[in-house]
């Protein structure tokens, strides 16, 4: 290496060391938000003068109070203007309004999302004086007794509050004042946020808690020079609470949690290189973050499900997704209402698998397309007549007859045939590979009372008896048992795998070879029992309570299974669905309601100016990161100023990471996707766009001419965003009259704002 290169390297290295030392010594700010954001205000003063006279400082303090109020007022207007002109159930209000009704009726239901957002919908109904008696049928007119406007206003407040949070986030990052205003304007005048914010949906709640999580995360980062101080603990705990609320609305909250987790790992890894830090302090950093960023969010998540279970105390549409004992304790449930002991022949039962996510043993007339080509046997998560079975005597003995008067109770260790009530087929297995789990045997419906073989015979093995009833009998709900094939020696089991489309994506049932004894996939219980010949259940009989944590895990697994089943149907065209690449490019939008001339119409589409610009900014910032890495490898040190480095991290790098975490999963996932899935990722793209303005135009503030040009660019782009929002405002505020009146908004053939035949 030449002497000049060597000298350059040593200077750059010294500058890098100096930068690290400066970063360690950098102080954060005081407890109030306005004071904690003062570093951004100090940076703003450079736009005007190197000196900071008292009058200018007063103006900045006044700005930090007045502008958030103005921006919030504008946000309330853009989210709530004409919010009630469409008195029909719009888009997914049909789902989430109905779920809110279930909370007011206390009826148990099942959905793919965690409960916090839907409980807030229920709260909005309660505050609006609604009694929960309506089920929000899609497209129907709201009844007079339901104040849907108040419910929508409640939801819109979450969307509106994202705007002041964006303002404070920009200040916390350290953006200059023009950039703070720009970022706030980008969020304020975003058509997609304004459109979805006015309906009874979860998206605005999800966005609010996501924005709150990132804001509190940045504020916590700004306290890094004062670890374990009151402000440090405050923002750590607020971050944890915000993360817990985000994931409690939708599982998409895992993405922002992952971003904070990556930051935390990098932070702790950096501390490990600090020889001045004692091991005790280092371990305390670990413990504090485990508590604040793992335990606190998990407790929030857990608490939401506890409230969910406590509120939904009555039987409802989602009962079958839960364990049998859980269902039995729901008010009005028919589970466990039958006689206590199971009898041969006369007892018609449904049989529930006890694995996490277990379903009811089921069969139907459709046959396997391969293998034996016999009748399918599956597990099904919903109540159905095809879930009903009865026990008959083993093959070779006389079949049970309705003329028999003596009651013969089922006993463990005895061999029986299990007969499907509606088709008369015997539960059967044979040495044929199962359709999905090829190492296990297929289970089918085969034969009848005449046709069959010894592979129809199954032995009941009791594994657990809850209660003090006769241990030698099979009891409804409280007896856990295994079902062993006498001939093959394998056990009836639900694998957890879903069958293909020919099996209606129901759960696979197999005969499992050599399972371990505690494998709950082979454990079953009687869920419902009908038998008029037996005495009813004693009135004073009480089922044992279920374990909350087990119910919590069971429900979450059922939610994941339902979510994974939301895959596109190749035989059907879903005109509402879209691909991830179409979102940042605005290739498509989404009609949110019927397109008749008589009703106001809404079209979900981002503000073109900001969405396209943010997409370009993401690509530009990616290229910038690559260039900086190449220069760093060649011993060049950029971003020497600690303030610039901090803005780069909080305003560019971590928003890019958050954007990727919120966007890329939808690129690779197999489930059906829609335009609104991009809304959280769009927020981080807007932050990156603001950073590109801030960093790209920073040097222009050094001269008077540069400051003028900088002002023109900021003002011009903000005017473009506002103008674009207003131009497309009908898609957010409601398009009244024929859609042909708005065909001027159809910039591209893929936008179906106006009907194609009218365009």
From Swiss-Prot:
It holds the Pfam family PMT_4TMC. The modification Phosphoserine is found at residues 32, 38-39. Residues 2-64, 189-198, 273-289, 631-647, 698-710 are cytoplasmic. Keywords: Acetylation, Endoplasmic reticulum, Glycoprotein, Glycosyltransferase, Membrane, Phosphoprotein, Repeat, Transferase, Transmembrane, Transmembrane helix. SUPFAM superfamilies: MIR domain. It is found in: Endoplasmic reticulum membrane. One of its GO terms (molecular function) is dolichyl-phosphate-mannose-protein mannosyltransferase activity. CDD domains: beta-trefoil_MIR_PMT2-like. Its EC number is 2.4.1.109. Residues 339-394, 407-463, 471-529 form the MIR domain. Its main location: endoplasmic reticulum. The modification N-acetylserine is found at residue 2. InterPro entries: GlyclTrfase_39-like, Glyco_trans_39/83, MIR_dom_sf, MIR_motif, PMT_4TMC. Residues 86-167, 220-251, 311-609, 669-676, 732-759 are lumenal. It catalyses: a di-trans,poly-cis-dolichyl beta-D-mannosyl phosphate + L-seryl-[protein] = 3-O-(alpha-D-mannosyl)-L-seryl-[protein] + a di-trans,poly-cis-dolichyl phosphate + H(+); a di-trans,poly-cis-dolichyl beta-D-mannosyl phosphate + L-threonyl-[protein] = 3-O-(alpha-D-mannosyl)-L-threonyl-[protein] + a di-trans,poly-cis-dolichyl phosphate + H(+). Residues 1-50 are annotated as: Disordered. Glycans are attached at residues 131, 155, 403. One of its GO terms (biological process) is protein O-linked glycosylation. It is a multi-pass membrane protein. Residues 28-37 have a biased composition (Low complexity). Protein O-mannosyltransferase involved in O-glycosylation which is essential for cell wall rigidity. Forms a heterodimeric complex with PMT2 and more rarely with PMT5 to transfer mannose from Dol-P-mannose to Ser or Thr residues on proteins. The PMT1-PMT2 complex participates in oxidative protein folding, ER-associated protein degradation (ERAD), as well as ER export. PMT1 and PMT2 form a functional heterodimer. The complex interacts with endoplasmic reticulum proteins EMP24, ERV25, ERP1, ERP2, CDC48, HRD1, USA1, YOS9, ERO1, PDI1, UBR1, Cue4, DFM1 and TED1. Forms also a minor complex with PMT5. Belongs to the glycosyltransferase 39 family. Present with 6510 molecules/cell in log phase SD medium. This is Dolichyl-phosphate-mannose--protein mannosyltransferase 2. It comes from Saccharomyces cerevisiae (strain ATCC 204508 / S288c) (Baker's yeast). The gene is PMT2.
């Amino acid at each position: 290496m030449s002497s000049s290169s060597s000298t350059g390297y040593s200077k750059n290295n010294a500058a890098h060391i100096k930068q690290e030392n400066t970063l360690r010594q950098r102080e954060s700010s005081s407890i109030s938000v306005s004071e904690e954001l003062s570093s951004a205000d100090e940076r703003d003063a450079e736009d005007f003068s190197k000196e900071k006279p008292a009058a200018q400082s007063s103006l900045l303090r006044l700005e930090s109070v007045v502008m958030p109020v103005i921006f919030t007022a504008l946000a309330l207007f853009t989210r709530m203007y004409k919010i009630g002109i469409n008195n029909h159930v719009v888009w997914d209000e049909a789902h989430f309004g109905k779920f809110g009704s279930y909370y007011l009726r206390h009826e148990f239901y099942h959905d793919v999302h965690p409960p916090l957002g839907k409980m807030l919908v229920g709260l909005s109904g309660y505050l609006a004086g609604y009694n929960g008696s309506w089920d929000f049928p899609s497209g129907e007119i709201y009844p007079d007794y339901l104040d849907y406007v108040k419910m929508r206003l409640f939801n819109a407040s979450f969307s509106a509050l994202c705007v002041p949070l964006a303002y404070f986030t920009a200040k916390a990052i350290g953006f200059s004042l023009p950039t703070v205003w720009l970022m706030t304007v980008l969020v304020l005048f975003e058509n997609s946020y304004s459109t979805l914010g006015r309906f009874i949906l979860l998206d605005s709640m999800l966005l609010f808690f996501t924005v709150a999580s990132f804001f509190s995360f940045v504020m916590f980062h700004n306290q890094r020079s004062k670890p374990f101080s009151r402000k440090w603990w405050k923002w750590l705990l607020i971050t944890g609470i915000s993360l817990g609320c985000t994931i409690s609305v939708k599982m998409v909250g895992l993405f922002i949690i992952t971003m904070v987790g990556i930051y935390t790992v990098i932070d702790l890894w950096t501390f490990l290189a600090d020889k001045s830090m004692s091991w005790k302090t280092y371990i305390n950093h670990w413990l504090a973050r485990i508590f604040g960023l793992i335990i606190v969010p998990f407790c929030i998540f857990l608490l939401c499900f506890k409230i969910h279970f406590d509120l939904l105390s009555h039987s409802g549409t989602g009962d079958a997704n839960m364990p049998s004992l859980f269902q039995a304790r729901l008010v009005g449930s028919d589970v466990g209402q039958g006689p206590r002991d199971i009898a041969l022949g006369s007892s018609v039962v449904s049989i529930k698998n006890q694995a996490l996510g277990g379903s009811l043993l089921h069969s139907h007339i459709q046959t396997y397309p391969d293998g034996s080509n016999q009748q399918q046997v599956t597990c099904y998560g919903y109540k159905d007549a095809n879930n009903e079975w009865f026990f008959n005597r083993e093959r070779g003995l006389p079949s049970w007859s309705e003329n028999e008067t003596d009651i013969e109770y089922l006993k463990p260790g005895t061999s029986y045939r299990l007969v499907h009530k509606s088709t008369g087929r015997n539960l059967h297995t044979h040495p044929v590979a199962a359709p999905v789990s090829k190492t296990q045997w297929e289970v089918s419906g085969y034969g009848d009372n005449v046709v069959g073989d010894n592979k129809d015979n199954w032995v009941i093995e009791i594994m657990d008896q809850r209660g003090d009833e006769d241990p030698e009998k099979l009891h409804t709900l409280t007896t856990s048992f295994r079902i062993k094939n006498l001939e093959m020696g394998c056990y009836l089991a639900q694998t957890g795998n879903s069958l293909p489309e020919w099996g209606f994506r129901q759960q696979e049932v197999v005969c499992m070879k050599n399972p371990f004894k505690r494998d709950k996939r082979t454990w079953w219980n009687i869920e419902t029992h009908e038998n008029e010949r037996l005495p009813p259940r004693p009135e004073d009989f009480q089922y044992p309570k279920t374990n909350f944590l087990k119910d919590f895990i069971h429900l979450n697994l059922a939610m994941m299974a339902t979510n994974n089943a939301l895959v596109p149907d190749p035989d059907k065209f879903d005109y509402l669905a879209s691909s991830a690449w179409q979102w940042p490019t605005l290739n498509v939008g989404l009609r949110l309601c019927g397109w008749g001339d008589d009703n106001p119409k809404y079209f979900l589409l981002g503000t073109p100016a900001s969405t396209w610009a943010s997409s370009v900014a993401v690509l530009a910032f990616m290229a910038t990161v690559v260039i900086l890495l190449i220069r760093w490898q060649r011993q060049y040190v950029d971003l020497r100023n600690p303030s610039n480095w901090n803005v780069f991290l909080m305003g560019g790098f971590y928003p890019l990471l958050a954007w990727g975490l919120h966007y890329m999963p939808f690129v690779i996932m197999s489930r059906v996707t829609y335009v609104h899935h991009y809304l959280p990722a769009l927020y981080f793209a807007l932050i990156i766009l603001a950073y590109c303005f801030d960093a790209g135009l920073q040097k222009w503030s050094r001269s008077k001419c540069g400051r003028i040009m900088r002002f023109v660019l900021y003002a011009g782009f903000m005017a473009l965003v506002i103008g674009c929002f207003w131009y497309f405002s009908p898609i957010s505020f409601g398009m009244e009259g024929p859609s042909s009146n708005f065909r001027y908004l159809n910039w591209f053939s893929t936008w179906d704002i106006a009907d194609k035949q009218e365009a």
